């Protein structure tokens, strides 16, 4: 481990942490503070690591209308994506949209996304449709959500904790669906909520309805949401976003039943669907000319059934609580694209990605003297399939005897078994300060195998031959963790932690296929892939250093090996003999280090005349480099590392709760991705040459948002905001780091983020 990076970022994080509280002073002891409620973190709820919660109120206040905008003010979390019509590493039929979340420089499938513990399907790599031009990009993303359906979003930054059944190298984003108990309490047995919003960035209208009723013994909830919108506007001066219109519907029904004094049952059924029609041009890889005029009809849906039992036995001394959850999830993605290609004629392509998953999680908790012992088991079984159809005619029957395109990957079946044990031991020091030791371990076994290989058979490769190429893959991992925490004061804690993490290969990497039927070259997965692993170190501070200040700060260093990428060989491939093969391989190693800080200041705690005034400040910085196993390669900066970002905000909330207003400024440095020739390396014994590609530099930017609300009555609130108030023209780095500097000016302008936009909403709550 290279400790200079941890030392450097630790100094930055701790320096900022110690400096900020000096701007605040506590009130004198003789001052009265009768109306203030102080929320203290009970020792049993303190956890190490950077854990962020975005509440339903945060989503409303910050204009979080979709998968991406809920993260707009997070310093090291973002939602990269692509737009319809982009050409770099994209086919005409790959859909636009968000691909997933990026946390601390790792993105897409290296970040877990789940809803109530049920993981969402993986993002589908584009190499299956465009070959090596699509390395590192995705054709089907992970956006199966409607932000109105959730009470909160829990985020773990960095390697996931041992208690998280959905382990991942980069972190996790967990959406918690609405429940009746969130809105009901003793004395309130009914709830009605209605929300109506308009967002000018994509001219979308939203209507949401939440109804709940019941008591402590039996309650239920019904949530409905409808959205209608168009394409997200860009801010280019020469080309507008290509036209599209979309609609989505979501419904959730749930009930809670206190079946006995010991058992609480919760059941939830939720369904989401979205349809979209798009018209766009597809440009070539370098963004210099249009290759086809396309029309796409897209559909996706997700159905989930969850049953959860919380058992608190009174007659079993070694169990305080046992929580057991069962889930069933089905997802379907369907894209039909009519393509008018300039050289290949007119044809239609239909792509699908369908999954079916069963999930089981159980967690036991026991408090014994100064220990909190947690243990759990989990299991997941899933099937996926990728039906594919094209009417395209082969342009060269000798090279492509079965046409230019075939099924992108084999259908597969996968199951995973896991368990964890964690002991949280507290030691009291001087009757006030606590020291905590938290050892833990997670074990994971995963097995994946291909199915229905006969569906991939072509003229020169039958199902039996494919069975030799695509076989089962399995692995077992032991992932230890160790954390130390110390209470600087009862509400402010320092921590140091180590975690081992792993990311097992997915079906896209194991069984992907491109041109496997051709006599030219082939790009395929590898059934013998090893698991990606990491060692993660983090030092941080979190809590309330002084009255009126909430602060979370961390510095981290992560080291990775066995990153999966593609390597070129000339070798025999089943069914066609010797030729060029690009095959998935555990090719790269990498490291990432950085620091982040988030803080909030209640200025009214120190200056009574400023009661209602608050401020926030957040900053995130990270750096990361990777190196392949190729001769002559060197460490170069990872293109998934976002440039430094800071958020500064000032807010006023009327003490009489009549209105509030906030101004928030977001600043991000510019950055230019560093090109590499790893994807075109001949692997013939000569050193890896430098790349001649030159990427477009993404300029730094600063944008200002102005938001506010008015409580018209106790139950009716009008809220809204103006975003990018100064109409700044800018590009999002993580979504556009592979644009070429030589691309057409119009093409580059197509990728600009929205200019000045506004949102307006009405909330009714009874």
Regions found by a protein language model. Give the residues of each.
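Periplasmic N-terminal accessory/gating domains of Gram-negative outer-membrane beta-barrel systems
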Residues: 50-102, 107-109, 117-142, 154-160
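Outer-membrane beta-barrel signature, preferentially recognizing the C-terminal barrel domain
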Residues: 290-315, 353, 408, 412-414, ...
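Signature of Gram-negative outer-membrane beta-barrel scaffolds
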Residues: 372-489, 515-517
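Outer-membrane beta-barrel domain signature, strongest for Gram-negative TonB-dependent receptors
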Residues: 91, 245-384, 545-552
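C-terminal beta-signal and adjacent terminal beta-strands/loops
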Residues: 59, 121-124, 502, 561-562, ...
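Gram-negative outer-membrane beta-barrel transporters
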Residues: 27, 370, 427-429, 435, ...
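A beta-strand signature from Gram-negative outer-membrane beta-barrel systems
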Residues: 139-193, 765
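Transmembrane beta-barrel wall of Gram-negative outer-membrane proteins
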Residues: 198-228, 238-279, 297-312, 424-429, ...
């Amino acid at each position: 481990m290279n400790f200079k990076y941890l030392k450097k970022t630790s100094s930055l994080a701790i320096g900022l942490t110690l400096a900020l509280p000096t701007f605040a002073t506590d009130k004198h002891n003789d001052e009265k503070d009768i109306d203030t409620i102080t929320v203290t973190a009970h020792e049993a709820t303190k956890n190490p690591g950077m854990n962020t919660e975005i509440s339903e109120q945060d989503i409303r206040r910050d204009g979080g209308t979709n998968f991406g905008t809920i993260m707009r003010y997070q310093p090291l979390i973002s939602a990269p994506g692509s737009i319809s019509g982009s050409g770099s590493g994209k086919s005409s039929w790959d859909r636009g949209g968000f691909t997933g979340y990026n946390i601390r420089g790792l993105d897409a499938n290296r970040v877990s996304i789940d809803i109530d513990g049920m993981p969402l399907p993986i993002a589908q790599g584009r190499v299956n449709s465009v070959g090596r031009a699509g390395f590192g990009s995705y054709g089907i993303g992970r956006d199966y959500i409607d932000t109105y359906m959730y009470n909160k979003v829990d985020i773990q930054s960095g390697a996931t904790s041992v208690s998280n059944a959905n382990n991942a190298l980069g972190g996790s984003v967990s959406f918690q669906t609405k429940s009746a108990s969130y809105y009901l309490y003793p004395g309130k047995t009914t709830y009605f909520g209605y929300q109506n919003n308009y967002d000018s960035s994509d001219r979308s209208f939203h209507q949401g309805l939440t109804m709940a009723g019941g008591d402590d013994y039996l309650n239920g909830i019904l949530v409905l949401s409808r959205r209608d919108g168009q394409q997200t506007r860009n801010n280019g001066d020469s080309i507008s976003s290509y036209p599209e219109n979309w609609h989505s519907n979501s419904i959730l029904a749930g009930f809670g039943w206190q079946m006995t004094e010991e058992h609480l049952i919760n059941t939830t059924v939720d369904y989401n669907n979205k349809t979209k029609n798009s018209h766009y041009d597809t440009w070539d890889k370098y963004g210099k000319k249009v290759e086809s005029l396309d029309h796409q009809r897209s559909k996706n849906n997700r159905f989930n059934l969850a049953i959860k039992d919380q058992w608190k036995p009174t007659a079993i001394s070694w169990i305080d609580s046992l929580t057991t959850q069962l889930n069933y999830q089905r997802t379907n993605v369907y894209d039909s694209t009519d393509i008018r290609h300039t050289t290949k004629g007119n044809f239609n392509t239909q792509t699908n990605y369908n999954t079916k998953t069963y999930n089981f999680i159980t967690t036991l908790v026991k408090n014994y003297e100064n220990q909190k012992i947690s243990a759990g088991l989990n299991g997941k079984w899933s099937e996926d399939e990728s039906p594919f159809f094209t009417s395209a005619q082969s342009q060269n029957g000798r090279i492509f005897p079965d046409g230019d395109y075939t099924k992108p990957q084999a259908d597969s079946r996968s199951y995973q078994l896991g368990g964890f044990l964690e002991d949280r031991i507290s030691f009291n020091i001087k009757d006030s300060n606590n020291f905590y030791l938290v050892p833990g371990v997670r074990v994971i076994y995963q097995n994946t195998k291909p199915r229905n290989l006969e569906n991939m058979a072509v003229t020169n490769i039958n199902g039996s031959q494919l069975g030799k190429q695509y076989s089962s893959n399995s692995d077992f991992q032991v992932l230890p963790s160790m954390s130390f925490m110390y209470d600087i004061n009862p509400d402010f804690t320092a921590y140091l932690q180590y975690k081992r993490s792993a990311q097992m290969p997915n079906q896209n990497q194991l069984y992907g296929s491109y041109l496997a039927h051709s006599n030219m070259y082939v790009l395929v997965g590898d059934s013998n892939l090893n698991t990606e692993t990491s060692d993660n170190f983090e030092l941080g501070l979190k809590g309330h250093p002084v009255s009126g200040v909430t602060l979370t700060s961390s510095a981290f260093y992560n080291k990775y090996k066995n990153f999966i990428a593609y390597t070129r060989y000339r070798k025999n491939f089943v069914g066609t003999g010797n030729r060029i093969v690009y095959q998935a391989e555990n090719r790269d190693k990498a490291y990432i280090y950085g620091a982040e800080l988030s803080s909030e200041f209640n200025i009214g705690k120190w200056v009574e005349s400023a009661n209602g005034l608050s401020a926030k400040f957040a900053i995130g910085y990270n750096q990361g480099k990777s190196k392949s196993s190729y001769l002559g390669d060197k460490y170069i900066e990872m293109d998934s590392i976002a440039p430094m970002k800071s958020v500064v905000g000032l807010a006023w909330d009327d003490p009489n709760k009549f209105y509030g207003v906030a101004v928030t400024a977001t600043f991000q440095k510019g950055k230019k991705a560093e090109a590499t020739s790893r994807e075109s390396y001949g692997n013939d014994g000569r050193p890896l040459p430098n790349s001649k590609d030159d990427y477009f530099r993404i300029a730094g930017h600063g944008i200002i948002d102005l938001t506010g609300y008015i409580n018209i009555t106790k139950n009716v609130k009008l809220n809204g905001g103006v975003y990018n108030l100064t109409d700044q023209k800018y590009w999002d780095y993580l979504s556009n780091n592979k644009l070429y500097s030589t691309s057409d000016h119009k093409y580059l302008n197509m990728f600009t983020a929205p200019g000045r936009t506004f949102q307006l909403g009405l909330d009714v709550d009874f």
